[in-house]
Amino acid sequence: MCTMPLMKLKKMMRRTAFLLSVLIGCSMLGSDRSDKAPHWELVWSDEFDYSGLPDPEKWDYDVGGHGWGNQELQYYTRARIENARVGGGVLIIEARHEPYEGREYTSARLVTRGKASWTYGRFEIRARLPSGRGTWPAIWMLPDRQTYGSAYWPDNGEIDIMEHVGFNPDVVHGTVHTKAYNHLLGTQRGGSIRVPTARTDFHVYAIEWTPEEIRWFVDDSLYYRFPNERLTDPEADWRHWPFDQPFHLIMNIAVGGAWGGQQGVDPEAFPAQLVVDYVRVYRWVE
């Protein structure tokens, strides 16, 4: 009798199908490129097929409990198994209600900064979101350095692949912030989509970032586009589109905060988990 957990078995089946598709794509590389259609090519991934802490070759941590510019309540810990761990084929980021370093909650904020960054590409994350008032999971991107303007943020941009706030369950948001378009001015640009099973089932949250635009998807359903105005408006500049430089990935659960805590925090909602099946990054090949 098979005793393998159903979730892990399904993951292995998806992983096998994914590897077959990659192998087929690789076998085509030897063919005449004039006959090969443009496509997305995998360049980086974490399938979480191991156990323990997140792979230190791929992930680092943002650490601290200073509110993170959003009046957040959690302390982000470093390499603490209670807050970030891999097992059963998934990554679990867990926010907990517990005293730690002067804060009432703990969580983790994983980053690829210093490990991997990209300019343009398709970024694909299969995840199940946490429940509960006061939870604020996010999968997003920030630039590696300050290239434009007098401030790192918002001058150099932010790409929110997926955000969800617990007081507005099953509504997923995709947003950009720039010098011209940001929440401090009330001018941020983005879209939202209802995902009725976001907290009970896994869904694929993705963006496709090109020199022309950024596109947001849930399960390959397009729900928002942000165009590069510098290509059509002679007055537009980096203030409108700073997205021509390397960005790194971030995954976290915040607690409370200016947005996530608008209707308070329910302590009974914790521990709360953002569960990630995989993270995949592709580049466009002509």
From Swiss-Prot:
Membership in a protein family: Belongs to the glycosyl hydrolase 16 family.
Keywords: Glycosidase, Hydrolase, Signal
GO terms assigned for molecular function: licheninase activity
Pfam family, one: Glyco_hydro_16
PANTHER family with a match to the protein in the record: GLYCOSIDE HYDROLASE FAMILY 16 PROTEIN (PTHR10963:SF55), GLYCOSYL HYDROLASE-RELATED (PTHR10963)
Protein's recorded name: Beta-glucanase
Catalytic activity field: Hydrolysis of (1->4)-beta-D-glucosidic linkages in beta-D-glucans containing (1->3)- and (1->4)-bonds
Active site per the UniProt annotation: E158, E163
Dependence of activity on temperature: Optimum temperature is 85 degrees Celsius.
